[in-house]
């Protein structure tokens, strides 16, 4: 398991070689959280050269959020705020990143393994598909309303917070979202957990 993460300063973290088998180009990553048991990871990744990898299947649920630069996945070009998610077993198209691009990488339920493929693995649910989102084109939604938070799955309305829901697993309810707080917002400790892992 990954240790519980409090507030960290990424400036204190060191760069490691990027964990991208079968890729061409150079990348480095800073581990924000790393599960040494199964390889799950949250990291900042920097591409030090133009970078590319063929289409294939990751050994983990894999998410990229573009902080700066440009990522092309299949025919989709993503810039700052661009996001993609591929569940384990779903084909990720060929992908490129331009030199200097930085992303947040999230990898769950598996390690850095990757195999070339042009078809999804059998046995996937119908809703397990490649997701591509441009968060800059999304509206910030107040957490006071139930959608998209789905309070029936847990959580509490939190006035003053706003989210952009990037992905939600319909079976587990697990999700990836962006959060922003209104000016002067203060947390009520019973309404919201005080730690952000990613």
Language model: regions and residue ranges:
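A short, N-terminal "cap"/entry segment at the start of jelly-roll beta-barrel domains
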Residues: 1-37, 114-175
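Short acidic (Asp/Glu) patches
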Residues: 47-50, 67-68, 85-90, 107
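Short loop/turn motifs at secondary-structure junctions and domain boundaries
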Residues: 23-24, 54-56
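Glycine- and acidic-residue-biased ligand/ion/polar-headgroup-sensing regions
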Residues: 48-51, 57-73, 80, 182-198
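A short hydrophobic beta-strand segment most commonly corresponding to one strand
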Residues: 44, 84-85, 98-116
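Short acidic-glycine-tyrosine-enriched beta hairpin
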Residues: 72-93
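A structural signal for the main folded, soluble domain(s) of proteins
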Residues: 44, 49, 158, 170-171, ...
